Amino acid sequence: MKFATKLSLGCIALLSCALGAAGLLLTGQSFSGSLASTRTALQAQQEKEKYALERIIFQATDSAQFENYILASAAQQYAEQTADAGSSMALWLDGAYTLYSGLPAALPRTALKQALTNGENAWQLTRAAGRWYLLLTQPLDLPGVRADMLCAYDVSAVFATRDAQLRAWLA
């Protein structure tokens, strides 16, 4: 081969690699932005859910004592009133005991415990049964009780969009 042909093929290969890398970078940035905006929206939603659950708990009792059955009943009542296919919740006591859980059974208990350990304003992605879940924890403001609201939001659509973009780019 002549030098000019080799140079042309080398430039084409280099340009192809550069365009491929740029496409993957743009797809990654798009995914990161989409996941961040979804997470922010879900954190705001969870904050509203926390206040609504606290209101139900305070309405369920006339005393400052919060019995476990009252907490569990209030959590179940709230979950039934606000049932949504893309989200579910659990109420944990002292970070160790589940008082109520409407979470998907496929979510591993170790992931749930880790989300509780991470605490407020932390988030965790977990994959279970072919779905991606964003786990968020909020402590409830109840006097004398350490109760946490753990929510699992199905964010599989964000990952499906990313996968479709990658397939389109690589096709």
Label every model-predicted segment.
Residues 1-94:
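Juxtamembrane segments flanking the first transmembrane helix
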Residues 4, 8-12, 161-166, 170:
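Hydrophobic, aromatic-rich alpha-helical transmembrane segments
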Residues 65, 70-74, 107-114, 157:
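Exposed alpha-helical structural elements
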Residues 86-114:
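Extracellular/periplasmic ligand-sensing ectodomains of membrane signal-transduction proteins
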Residues 103-148:
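Membrane-proximal, non-catalytic sensory/regulatory domains of signal-transducing membrane proteins
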Residues 121, 170-171:
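Internal alpha-helical transmembrane segments of multipass membrane proteins
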Residues 140-145, 150-169:
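Helix-start (N-cap) segments at beta->loop->alpha junctions
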